[in-house]
């Protein structure tokens, strides 16, 4: 899907790059969509890109926030926007203002700008509310359930209601008397400042129905709803974290500057340490922050100059290690795609860590880490966005697409042909499948990388 008209010069500049459909097909992927974001790319640049299962939020330096419909592999909504559609562009704040990660929920997108936090309708792009912050934000805000959490520079977390004009749903479920209704509803909509006991430099994460954040000194804090009010659990890493934590449901993975990889789980009395593993590397002050990515039961950890390692997420056992250095992009099928230090988009096999395929990034020099879906999101500083999905062949492709009509027609033919004559010709179409290999060796159905 090409959602914006590209000039001939732009199309020629994509030849041989990661957005070239022929190059993408060669490595077992398909270009799902490509779009040019509408902003003054001669004066400003694209700076911050955040992904979710159903949306990509991109922020440009001129203060405009763009929302693009994305896909998670499921069938698109009926009469809904197709993947790659520009949903809206909303100007917020002044140009060249500091940009933080966007908080993306199904109905609300939260953006920090200067001393304000904006709540934007995710479908229309209209500003639902605007809240003045008591202190500058230190990281991106996050909507979770009925609340929005904003880390502040004064080592607190500002909690706001998602809908400032309606009481939270958990308060409505309580047994309130008429005398308490007016006062409790007023208090439930008031912002609350929560002490974080440390500086928060990474966007908080969703933890079940609650929220999790980590301070720069390694204090993990979880706040989740309880039968009466809220529960707060904390755990000390005894060292500074070496990057953002990874969360799946109520399981936490974190690493420290001294090179310790840990896993925590939610327990009745707080967080419980499941296992810890000592890595071969430690973080120096000038080194970039490593990454953690979880794919099924494989935990991927970047080791800086030491490369990339994979661990068993259940017990922490080391699976493999490669010397390739790179920034994680996405996990697609049986491969990890990363932007390596040689300015290549490289695929690594998750089973053994071997490099398997390469793409030239071309103008897409902004690494975008996508943990929400099996999609590679390409981004250029001048506002060109593209999505690469796994290539699906034959019957697998029809399974992903809404092909009820085609399945009905195939069933009808099977029912009609025996009525005419029980010829073996009715079995031939089943024997001749679409995914049979063509004479070309590079397009075999399950040999995606042409080897």
PLM regions: where:
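A structural motif specific to WD40 beta-propellers
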Residues: 32, 76-77, 87, 126-129, ...
């Amino acid at each position: 899907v090409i959602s914006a008209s590209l000039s001939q010069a732009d199309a020629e500049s994509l030849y041989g790059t990661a957005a070239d459909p022929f190059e993408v097909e060669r490595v077992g992927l398909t270009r799902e969509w490509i779009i040019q974001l509408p902003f003054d790319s001669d004066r400003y640049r694209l700076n911050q890109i955040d992904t979710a299962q159903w949306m990509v939020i991109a922020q440009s330096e001129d203060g405009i926030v763009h929302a693009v419909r994305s896909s998670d592999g499921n069938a698109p909504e009926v009469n809904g926007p197709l993947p790659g559609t520009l949903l809206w562009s909303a100007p917020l704040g002044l140009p060249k203002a500091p940009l933080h990660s966007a908080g993306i929920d199904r109905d609300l997108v939260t953006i920090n700008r200067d001393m304000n936090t904006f709540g934007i309708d995710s479908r229309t792009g209209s500003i639902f509310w605007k809240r003045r912050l008591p202190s500058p934000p230190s990281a991106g805000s996050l909507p979770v359930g009925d609340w929005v959490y904003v880390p502040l520079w004064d080592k607190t977390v500002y909690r706001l209601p998602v809908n400032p004009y309606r009481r939270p749903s958990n308060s409505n479920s309580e047994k309130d008397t008429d005398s308490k209704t007016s006062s409790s509803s007023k208090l439930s909509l008031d912002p609350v400042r929560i002490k974080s006991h440390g500086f928060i430099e990474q966007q908080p994460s969703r933890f079940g129905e609650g929220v999790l954040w980590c301070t720069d000194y390694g204090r993990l804090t979880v706040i989740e709803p309880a039968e009466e009010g809220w529960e707060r659990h904390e755990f000390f890493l005894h060292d500074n974290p070496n990057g953002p934590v990874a969360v799946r449901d109520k399981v936490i993975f974190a690493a420290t500057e001294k090179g310790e990889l840990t896993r925590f789980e939610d327990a009745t009395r707080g967080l419980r340490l499941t296992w810890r593993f000592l890595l071969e590397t430690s973080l120096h002050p000038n080194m970039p922050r490593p990454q953690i990515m979880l794919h099924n039961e494989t935990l991927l950890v970047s080791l800086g100059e030491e490369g990339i390692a994979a661990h068993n997420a259940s017990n922490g056992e080391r699976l493999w290690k490669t010397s390739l250095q790179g920034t994680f992009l996405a996990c697609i099928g049986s491969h990890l795609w990363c932007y390596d230090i040689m300015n290549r988009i490289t695929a690594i096999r998750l089973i053994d860590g071997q490099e398997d395929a390469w793409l030239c990034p071309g103008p897409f020099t902004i690494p975008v880490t996508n943990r929400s879906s099996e999609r590679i999101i390409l981004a250029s500083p001048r506002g060109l966005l593209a999505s690469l999905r796994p290539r699906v062949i034959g019957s697998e492709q029809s399974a992903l697409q809404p092909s009820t009509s085609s399945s009905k027609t195939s069933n009808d033919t099977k029912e009609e042909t025996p009525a005419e004559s029980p010829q073996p010709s009715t079995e031939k179409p089943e024997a001749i499948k679409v995914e049979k290999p063509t004479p070309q060796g590079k397009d075999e159905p399950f040999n995606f990388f042409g080897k």
